[in-house]
Amino acid sequence: MNADVFEAVCAMGDAARTAQSQLAQANTEAKNQLLNAIADALDQHADDIAAANTLDMNKAETDGMDAGKLDRLKFDQQRITAAAQGVRHVASLPDPIGEIVRGYHLENGLRLQQVRVPIGVLGMIYEARPNVTVDVASLCIKSGNAVLLRGGHAAEHTNAATLAVIADVLTKHGYDHNMIATVDQYGRDGATAMMEARGHIDVLIPRGGAGLIQAVVRNSKVPVIETGAGNVHIYVDRTGNPDKAIPILINAKTQRVGVCNATEKLLVHKDIAESFLPKAAAALAAAGVEMHADERAYGIIEHAGIANAQLVHATDEDWDTEYLALKIGIKVVDSLDEAIAHINRHSTGHTESIIAEDYSAIEEFTARIDSAVVMVNASTRFTDGGVFGFGAELGISTQKMHARGPMGLHEMTTTKWIGYGTGQVRE
């Protein structure tokens, strides 16, 4: 790692902390005014941001970026407008800062309160996701945090244009623009420096593919909140309703293939496989999905006359693969127990869904599946901070400490204890 870059990034972290102390003093009304001003500015400068995104998109296409990543990189007028609306929604949400989590009196009269406070300085390392720049900025402002961003070279023009708009609004409203800053100018050395900057950055959040996330988890000296890759499953129980299951499956697999809440695996109970799989396979084939089927599923689908280039034999590697493409693994299971065991063995702990009408099966599945989100008779695509009503999200945490699932305002806070006394001393 370049020593000069490390020193510069540490200095940026310190400047962000100074800026954060100013933001922490702002009341809810002031933060909301700032957020609404940023939303308005994003709308006003949407043409400039979209033009910058076109530069990034053209280069990515020339470089051969795959369709899933290109979709995430896209930040056109429609998505900029949606991002601005997300900022306004964050402004409308209750302020978590100062919220009393719990409180009580000790026998000696000392009154204790646990209250929510900002974490401090966050670091965000992500790739080809320009919407994240807006989401993180809005959530940090509302929760009183500063942030250093490493948005990756693929979105460098888009992120630069977006951050210029945000910095201008911060300055015009009397805030230190260092509270939201980027290290993109330092390339990969900037990301490495962020991982080393313990004491200058309080927590690091990676968001991207499995390779990026694991590189940060393994190498960071700064505490990490791990956002997960999405090896996401749908299990169709023997009591599952095909009229529900097939639309859910097609939505979950094909609506946006390059996102972490897209379904990658389909498990089907043996009692319904013969009747369900031909219909499901026909729908998947019509949507252009390549099916990687185990032996039993392959036989059923082939017998139904859907054997073509879109049907291949699954390998052991398939069960652990997040495709982020028009591909899906299909397996027939003998029981609910087998489905749960398979999912808990191969899932990344993101989102799983059960399609069933039997309440006992639903209860068992939701209780035993060890993932951040479990859906019942619904698409896995709903696992999203915006859909959950958070306005925006930092990512979807698949770890169990501090945060799990979509991370919104509350997940960007920590707590401290305040003791109110009248002269008490400990005996």
From Swiss-Prot:
Enzyme's top EC category: oxidoreductase
E.C. number(s) listed in UniProt: 1.2.1.41
Keyword Amino-acid biosynthesis: yes
Localization (cell): Cytoplasm
Keywords: Amino-acid biosynthesis, Cytoplasm, NADP, Oxidoreductase, Proline biosynthesis
UniProt keyword Amino-acid biosynthesis present: yes
Family matches, as InterPro entries: Ald_DH/histidinol_DH, Ald_DH_C, Ald_DH_N, Aldehyde_DH_dom, G-glutamylP_reductase_CS, Glu-5-SA_DH, GPR_dom
PROSITE patterns linked: PROA
Pathway field: Amino-acid biosynthesis; L-proline biosynthesis; L-glutamate 5-semialdehyde from L-glutamate: step 2/2
Principal location listed in the UniProt entry: cytoplasm
Molecular functions (GO terms): glutamate-5-semialdehyde dehydrogenase activity; NADP binding
Biological processes, Gene Ontology terms: L-proline biosynthetic process
NCBIfam families: PRK00197.1, proA
Its job: Catalyzes the NADPH-dependent reduction of L-glutamate 5-phosphate into L-glutamate 5-semialdehyde and phosphate. The product spontaneously undergoes cyclization to form 1-pyrroline-5-carboxylate.
Family (UniProt): Belongs to the gamma-glutamyl phosphate reductase family.
Record protein name field: Gamma-glutamyl phosphate reductase
Organism (species): Bifidobacterium adolescentis (strain ATCC 15703 / DSM 20083 / NCTC 11814 / E194a)
